């Protein structure tokens, strides 16, 4: 039987480039398990920080070294020149995190190519990336969440007379403490916590430097709970896990510094709460029209028993130590079987 040709696509132009490389290395290892070797011929492709696609030879060098390709940022490049092997792929496994990878742009390209790919389509990816659109979808589905306010860069930078009024509105509608986030960045990039007016002004200015769309959320004292979802039209939820950390909040530095955070699987929470989280995770998956895989993050307010949805990540980190594969491992689905299942889900969705 001919092997299915899988294009493993990693790298990308976002700030999560190195995370993508690590995810791809783990996925390639999973494809090297005997059962997967018999079914799939995996060809890696690398997108550098300029957006250029590189062939399997370069991609393998990057995966071996674990280091991104050194490039000159000021040179003009032809981003439309794809390696010739691209047209031979039967299914793609994109593992690009952040903008230009999991925001619907790449998914649109693969859809135009009329080829199967792992993960959500254009709509699910867009909604899963933009926190404002995501929260609108969650609200429409009746999922409880913290108070939030959507604003734009122009409100922050354009008119110095309007900015103080904006800060007054945030203080009145959301209150302190609050979190200020760029709407379209992942891995907690650009997030700030504001406890007072001075910190709010600085946080808004910082977020505006990252994105033209900004979201302000009410702070809440809660445990951070996560659940993995797998499937297409009939998705299944994993066991529930918890993220614990030693900082004021779960920012980029805490997330990617060894020893600053840890995972607890399964989370030490009541069964009733765990079941509620799993049900809400599936509802969130459907609310954004996700496909294949997603990790859904929640706040569990222990003193009231409330479960509030935080966000959905339609292309979560995929290293051996990432929460998504670890949740499925604890549920009984090993890494190599998970990778196989995701490819099969992609092929099934393409057939429909």
Curated annotation (Swiss-Prot):
Catalytic activity: 2 D-alanine + ATP = D-alanyl-D-alanine + ADP + phosphate + H(+)
Positions of ATP binding: 171-226
Protein EC: 6.3.2.4
Compartments, record wording: Cytoplasm
Residues involved in Mg(2+) 2 binding: 311, 313
Gene Ontology annotations of biological process type: cell wall organization; peptidoglycan biosynthetic process; regulation of cell shape
UniProt entry tagged with the keyword GTP-binding: no
Chain residues that bind Mg(2+) 1: 297, 311
Broad class of where this protein is predominantly found: cytoplasm
Domain ATP-grasp: 135-344
Cofactor: Mg(2+); Mn(2+)
GO CC, alphabetical: cytosol
Keyword Transferase among record annotations: no
InterPro entries: ATP-grasp, ATP_grasp_subdomain_1, D-Ala_lig_Van_CS, D_ala_D_ala, Dala_Dala_lig_C, Dala_Dala_lig_N, PreATP-grasp_dom_sf
Protein family according to the UniProt entry: Belongs to the D-alanine--D-alanine ligase family.
HAMAP family: Dala_Dala_lig
Name recorded for this polypeptide: D-alanine--D-alanine ligase
Biological source species: Microcystis aeruginosa (strain NIES-843 / IAM M-2473)
